[in-house]
Amino acid sequence: MVGTCHSMAASRSTRVTRSTVGLNGLDESFCGRTLRNRSIAHPEEISSHSQVRSRSPKKRAEPVPTQKGTNNGRTSDVRQQSARDSWVSPRKRRLSSSEKDDLERQALESCERRQAEPAPPVFKNIKRCLRAEATNSSEEDSPVKPDKEPGEHRRIVVDHDADFQGAKRACRCLILDDCEKREVKKVNVSEEGPLNAAVVEEITGYLTVNGVDDSDSAVINCDDCQPDGNTKQNNPGSCVLQEESVAGDGDSETQTSVFCGSRKEDSCIDHFVPCTKSDVQVKLEDHKLVTACLPVERRNQLTAESASGPVSEIQSSLRDSEEEVDVVGDSSASKEQCNENSSNPLDTGSERMPVSGEPELSSILDCVSAQMTSLSEPQEHRYTLRTSPRRAALARSSPTKTTSPYRENGQLEETNLSPQETNTTVSDHVSESPTDPAEVPQDGKVLCCDSENYGSEGLSKPPSEARVNIGHLPSAKESASQHTAEEEDDDPDVYYFESDHVALKHNKDYQRLLQTIAVLEAQRSQAVQDLESLGKHQREALKNPIGFVEKLQKKADIGLPYPQRVVQLPEIMWDQYTNSLGNFEREFKHRKRHTRRVKLVFDKVGLPARPKSPLDPKKDGESLSYSMLPLSDGPEGSHNRPQMIRGRLCDDSKPETFNQLWTVEEQKKLEQLLLKYPPEEVESRRWQKIADELGNRTAKQVASRVQKYFIKLTKAGIPVPGRTPNLYIYSRKSSTSRRQHPLNKHLFKPSTFMTSHEPPVYMDEDDDRSCLHSHMSTAAEEASDEESIPIIYRSLPEYKELLQFKKLKKQKLQQMQAESGFVQHVGFKCDNCGVEPIQGVRWHCQDCPPEMSLDFCDSCSDCPHETDIHKEDHQLEPVYKSETFLDRDYCVSQGTSYSYLDPNYFPANR
């Protein structure tokens, strides 16, 4: 049988590849790297390559279809039966009525087209005739791509083998269940006439020497093949020989040795079954998808040069030519292509598979892709497969990295794979795309394939495709680990800016913080839209309140926005960033006692003193209005991080009120308990009683608070309800503090120690006018004079008479100052004599309205001047000092208060 293969191989031109070294009678040592650059060709059959046409994946010419008249009727019957009677798994749903009608329509069109086509007398090599006949064919008659024909060739062999009565094929059926359950069931059918063990060994050696990996040898060494005397169809050389005889004369004698007895097309191939991608499978998918989109000449040139050119050049050119390809493609064009595939099954019967093993693998992929699109026609969605730059760079740097497949269990696992499984892997990987869950069919599909079907593919596989082991099917554990690693590599954290420092770009805490900020900004935008929506619904409800109430009673959907779960800030371990003391911390290291009093002014708004921690137990009935972002990239045990409360670490051993400020209510209750529980010999017992009474503070916290409280009372001169502390210890310490600075007083929360102590307020209730018109020094003198008089005498009439004398004294002093000095009341005019400005004493009418009041000079104050508003009996008030315009912006502020708007404010002088 080997000699027959050799004689047939010598009779036709071919390229010498790893798969044809044994067939051409060459030595095994010839299989080196120089093998790719050598060829054995006969001058009578050398054909020149035509020019590469435009890259249009949808409009391509088709060769004149040829047909074998002897097999026309039989093939159409078999094809119609296969389209209707596909084997259905008991766990999958049957095809819908629309899908069945579509398949029947395709079958009828194929019958009509085959009857209308004549059968040529001579069968030529279609692969070489395509280029010559492409220009003579019209696009209306040939909407299908010519590179679909190798897939059709297998169907012809199936039809030939269907009539063979002497041999039965062994079929392995892969039942691919629902997409959610990745289960593979194997159904083995017994086979008559197993292989001879010697022939199996020889074929395995050929495949190994010719560059086909061990996984391809599993085609022969599978459990379906039983070694005995029948050599049947498993010899690769005889397979090719029989293939040529079928293509040449179409006699039924060669049908006994045809190896492709598969009913592969009879079942609906499920291209949507999810498959876990490994690195090898991803590269195979990228290469196939790119090849499917190339023009016919370019694709044939690539497949022809794959045996002679380096693998790395082909792979890099494919990846460079297409970085983004359309996976599904145009649904209408694919539909026509699939119909043409089913209508012309005999066209490819005249095409001979090359002995050198240069398969039209890309054509097969196109055919399978067209079938996939026709099955998914109700959902015409387009998806784009974007090649990851990292993956592309990896492929360019090491293109031959995957020449040998990944192994988990060694040769045992590879030999357990049947050729059916290898074909299944090919079909799944070709059609695999990022589809929607809704696009995945819910019914399981069945793939029935002959055990010897892949023998010729293993032989006819070029080196460029041999680098990707098609027969490799990784285990679930290996696939899951590779898939997880790929997700981690291809989906890095992108929450950083390009201008950030390198240390920040790869910092998980920084990325998590930016992610939280991004989510919060989105939630804020949504909240603004929700507020606008609420305002709109409010206006509509006010226009029709009765209808609005009726909708509420009927519980109808009004369209009100739903509340959001606000994302909380992530927990960050600040200890890893603040382990070493900086200059700022060294400077204020000795002032640590003041850190407990530090509180910003915006905390008075009502925010809790202690931030809500996710570690706090949730109360019953508490609405979960906050949510945390997932911490998938964080280290394990991140939820056990200790919490920081006001600069101090808090763990489970600390009380709930650890390092929290005392409220005003707690302080008042503490003062009451200090009076309730008198001092004891052992003060710790007193603190424990007070702590038990408070309920939320420990004895240690009470002792610390009472100590500070007593010091405050002692400094203020207020009696201490207990032992008086020694102020000498505390007075020795430096009193300079950031809190005492007048510029920092607004940054600190007022103390709660002296809440019950109310300082006295002194106010002159008899004469409010004196406070308005008198100088600040005069007001201070009056206050000091009144303080010298005891309170018990202030209600006597003598005290009131004394106050009147004081006022008269002040007026006389002011008059004397006015007469001795020259005073001009700028802006005031005498309403009687008309002198302007009034000099000396100005008399102002108190009874007239302020906007219409009259002013007189000192000489006209006694004249009986009357107007419509001013009467003679009105009371006049003397004004001794001129009221000039005073610009407060140029006055130095009194006291310790300040304003940044004051131009005279200089913080350096304070």
UniProtKB/Swiss-Prot annotation:
A GO molecular-function annotation: zinc ion binding
GO-annotated cellular components: ATAC complex; mitotic spindle; nucleolus; nucleoplasm
Chain residue ranges for the region called Disordered: 41-117, 133-153, 303-358, 373-444, 609-641
Domain HTH myb-type intervals: 654-714
Cross-link Glycyl lysine isopeptide (Lys-Gly) (interchain with G-Cter in SUMO2): where in chain: 283, 654, 715
Residues with the N6-acetyllysine modification: 401, 708
Location, primary (coarse class): nucleus
DNA-binding region as annotated in the record: 687-710
Location of Phosphoserine modifications: 89, 96, 137-138, 142, 613
Residues engaged in binding Zn(2+) 2: 845, 848, 870, 874
Gene3D superfamilies in UniProt: 3.30.60.90, Homeodomain-like
UniProt record, GO biological process: chromatin organization; regulation of cell cycle; regulation of cell division; regulation of DNA-templated transcription; regulation of embryonic development; regulation of transcription by RNA polymerase II
Binding annotation for Zn(2+) 1: 830, 833, 857, 860
Keywords from the named record: Acetylation, DNA-binding, Isopeptide bond, Metal-binding, Nucleus, Phosphoprotein, Transcription, Transcription regulation, Ubl conjugation, Zinc, Zinc-finger
Residue spans of biased composition, Basic and acidic residues class: 96-116, 142-153, 613-622
Zinc fingers classed as ZZ-type: ranges: 825-884
Function: Histone H3 reader that is required for the ATAC complex-mediated maintenance of histone acetylation and gene activation. Component of the ATAC complex, a complex with histone acetyltransferase activity on histones H3 and H4.
Subunit structure: Component of the ADA2A-containing complex (ATAC), composed of KAT14, KAT2A, TADA2L, TADA3L, ZZ3, MBIP, WDR5, YEATS2, CCDC101 and DR1. Interacts via (ZZ-type zinc finger) with histone H3 in a methylation-independent manner and acetylation on 'Lys-4' (H3K4ac) moderately enhances the interaction.
Designated name of the protein: ZZ-type zinc finger-containing protein 3
